[in-house]
From Swiss-Prot:
GTPase that plays an essential role in the late steps of ribosome biogenesis. This is GTPase Der. GO terms for molecular function: GTP binding; ribosome binding. Associates with the 50S ribosomal subunit. Keywords: GTP-binding, Nucleotide-binding, Repeat, Ribosome biogenesis. It holds the Pfam family MMR_HSR1. Residues 353-438 form the KH-like domain. The keyword GTP-binding applies. SUPFAM superfamilies: P-loop containing nucleoside triphosphate hydrolases. It comes from Prochlorococcus marinus (strain MIT 9301). NCBIfam families: GTPase_EngA, small_GTP. Belongs to the TRAFAC class TrmE-Era-EngA-EngB-Septin-like GTPase superfamily. EngA (Der) GTPase family.
């Protein structure tokens, strides 16, 4: 089951994200002393008193201003409240009650959601009680003084929170498939997330950099539960200023690290850029499963051969991910969006797959029968004794040979291709470890494991 949700709501810059990080004991919400840092609604898991729940951080709520992203942020806050079991209204104790606080309180009183008031920036316990008392006038019950920075009062606040939450059954992240949506700014990542979820889950704008957090969304497709991470667009380092975008990009790279599968989004109009290639390299370096999604395909003028020509051109520049499935979609119209889950699931399954040693050696034996290991000018020839899979995520194989130096890059690529093609490894990188060992040192090992050597000295 999806965990019960607490929606963090309040005016801009009252310390909502700092409080989220304190309650969740993490730094996943971007904290920066500037109003409007949080735009989308972002989710984190937390636990207290034996209960686990989900906290959703929302953007600063303003009712009387329609500039910049404020209308879109309002929509995100409304959606967060609709799915919440409890609302936590955060106010600034130093500023006292403002017109903005009163407007939000009136809106919350008219909703059906239970609300707890957290009076933030009450660093002094004695003064905090005095500052908090002013917020009785919001009409939402007893105000609770806390300090998000120092942590004071947050334990009592969490006691109140869990007392209002329903019982829940917990599904661990280990049971979910973690899928991150990766790409440059404005390639349509948030539009894709919205299309996948069937709702306006992330703010969509033609302005680059709209998403500054990594956004986690839970969704069920068939028998599988997915956690989808929409990341901030990743730019060249020289174009990144210190601030929220800097933190967001670092968060996006961390999203790659915690993913089971990455969806690399490419703009069909712009094609592959240098930054796309760097992202592809990053995914390959981290050993993640991946599918390539070419978005905005509806905007391309095409004939019967266009898709083949475009795929060939894109693949020539994304050679890091030559093993990835490529899908041409339109996040705007929904064209082929549902195919993403099918191919992503296949990539994850291949990424987690294990193959028996006997099967690996059948493939290797067949491969060298078609193309023998190279022979040096000195007359010394490479010998491949046997291979075995030593781990998965990604599939990693150790190949025992007489001398790794005798196996050049061309032959190594040939063997990798044979393993991939014959065993059906699509959507995942493969790692081949070439280990030099004398045959006599292997004899006891292969006898114990009942392995037949492919080649002998």
């Amino acid at each position: 089951m999806i965990l019960p949700t607490i929606a963090i709501i309040g005016r801009p810059n009252v310390g909502k994200s700092t409080l989220v990080n304190r309650l969740c004991q993490s730094n996943d919400a971007i904290v920066f002393d500037k109003p409007g840092v949080t735009r989308d609604r972002t989710y984190q898991n937390a636990s207290w008193g034996g209960k686990e729940f989900q906290i959703v951080d929302t953007g600063g709520l303003v009712f009387d201003d329609d500039s910049e992203f404020l209308p879109e942020i309002r929509t995100q806050v409304f959606l967060a409240l609709e799915e919440a079991s409890l609302a936590l209204l955060v106010v600034d104790g130093n500023q006292g009650v403002t017109d903005g606080d009163l407007s939000i309180a009136k809106w919350l009183r008219n909703s059906s959601c239970k609300t707890i008031v957290a009076v933030n920036k009450c660093e002094s316990t004695t003064l905090g009680i005095s500052l908090a008392s002013e917020f009785w006038k919001l009409g939402l019950g007893e105000p609770n003084p806390v300090s998000a920075i120092h942590g004071s009062g947050t334990g009592d606040l969490l006691d109140l929170v869990i007392g209002e939450l329903p019982e829940n059954n917990i599904q661990d992240d280990e049971e979910k498939i973690m899928m991150s949506i990766i790409g440059r700014p404005n390639v349509g990542k948030s539009s894709l997330l919205n299309s996948i979820c069937g709702e306006k889950r992330a703010i969509v704008s033609d302005i680059s950099g709209t998403t500054t957090d990594s956004i986690d969304t839970l969704i069920k497709k068939g028998d599988n539960h997915w956690k989808i991470i929409d990341t901030a667009g990743i730019r060249r380092k020289k174009n990144v200023k210190y601030g929220t975008e800097f933190f967001g990009i670092n968060r996006a790279f961390k999203s790659i690290d915690r993913s089971d599968v990455c969806v690399l989004v490419i703009d069909a109009i712009d094609g592959v850029t240098d930054q796309d290639q760097k992202l592809a390299g990053r995914i390959e370096e981290q050993g993640r499963a991946c599918i390539i999604v070419v978005n905005k395909w509806d905007l391309v003028e095409k004939n019967s051969s266009t898709i083949y020509q475009v795929e060939k051109e894109l693949r020539s520049k994304l050679y890091f991910l030559h093993w990835s499935k490529m899908i041409f979609i339109s996040a705007l119209t929904g064209q082929r969006v549902d195919n993403i889950f099918e191919h992503a699931l296949n990539a994850v399954n291949q990424h987690r797959r294990r193959v028996t040693t006997s099967v690996v050696n059948e493939v290797l034996k067949e491969s060298i029968s078609w193309k023998s290991p190279p022979t040096k000018r000195s007359g010394k020839q490479g010998r491949l004794y046997y291979g075995t899979q030593v781990k998965n995520k990604p599939p990693t194989f150790t190949l025992f040979v007489n001398d790794p130096k005798l196996f050049g890059i061309t032959y190594r690529r040939y063997i990798e291709k044979q393993i991939r093609v014959n065993l059906g490894f699509e959507g995942t990188p493969l790692i081949l470890l070439w280990r030099g060992k004398q045959q006599r040192a292997l004899n006891k090992e292969v006898e114990r494991e009942n392995i037949e050597l492919i080649q002998k000295d």
